[in-house]
UniProtKB/Swiss-Prot annotation:
Pathway, per record: Mycotoxin biosynthesis
UniProt keyword Nuclease, yes or no: no
Biased composition (Polar residues): 1-10
Location of region: Disordered: 1-22
UniProt key word Magnesium: no
EC identifiers of the protein: 3.-.-.-
Name of the protein this chain belongs to: AB hydrolase superfamily protein FGSG_00045
Highest taxon in the source lineage: Eukaryota
InterPro entries listed in its UniProt record: AB_hydrolase_1 (IPR000073), AB_hydrolase_fold (IPR029058), AB_hydrolase_sf (IPR050266)
Taxonomic lineage: Eukaryota, Fungi, Dikarya, Ascomycota, Pezizomycotina
Origin species: Gibberella zeae (strain ATCC MYA-4620 / CBS 123657 / FGSC 9075 / NRRL 31084 / PH-1)
Amino acid sequence: MAPISSTRPSHSIAADNPNPTTQVNFNTNMTETTIFYKSHNPGGESILLIHGGFSDGSEWDGVWPLLAEHNYHLLLPDMPSHGNSVDIHPFEIDDTVRRLAALIKAEARGGLAHVVGISIGGHIAAALASQHPSCVLSLIVSGFNIFTPNLFTPVLPLFVYGVQRGSGFARQPFAEWDRFCRGLGSLALTQDVFNILISSRELQTIECRTLVVAATRPGVSADNIDHSRRLFETVVAGNGSQVVQHRGMRHPWNEEEPKVFADMVKRWIITQELPDGFEVIP
């Protein structure tokens, strides 16, 4: 049987339409613009998949069907200023976390979900687990990179935006840049993304069982192991959490290797050994 998907607004889950789009407002303030999400295969244990920058929930199209085969319920939001949530501004951590926590509490089975985030979505996922530990069963963060502000930080978003709109000399080194070059990034969103990536904010404690992944295949899109370690230092010890790397994967490996990514997610959730190629970072 094909995975069942949701198409109705408000808090209902419909099982009668194979082409899902769900848009819903979980807040008492009914004038607030609604966040968009898709719900696939309701009824099973829930997994929330949080996409990267300049993207949307369709980034997971290669991953979610593989998880639905194992009877998981998949929630795929479009974050503020992205995809079908493009009219929600600005894109910032606390507001996005608030919206996603409301989504989990309203639509996930039992108000609980395993949370998976990649790249900018990893920043959101980590903050979600920190700020709303009661609704996160486990956490996977891949591609977490955070940089220290410097003198060039205020002008960097404008420079990058200008390069994309102008000479185009950069050659799409990673998924976010590829999407950006296809016109999926406004100047405002570019500034919001850089405010998350380049920040001196203090990372908050994460209590749940957590897997931090660095995709370290050599090249400009390799994740920074030190940044992965920094995030892992916020995870409470003694609950089976791990920080690992995969030397054969690049930053956007959820799109490039969806079968491996889905297998990793499934194994982490059921506490099995990770697939071949993952090695613990000392």
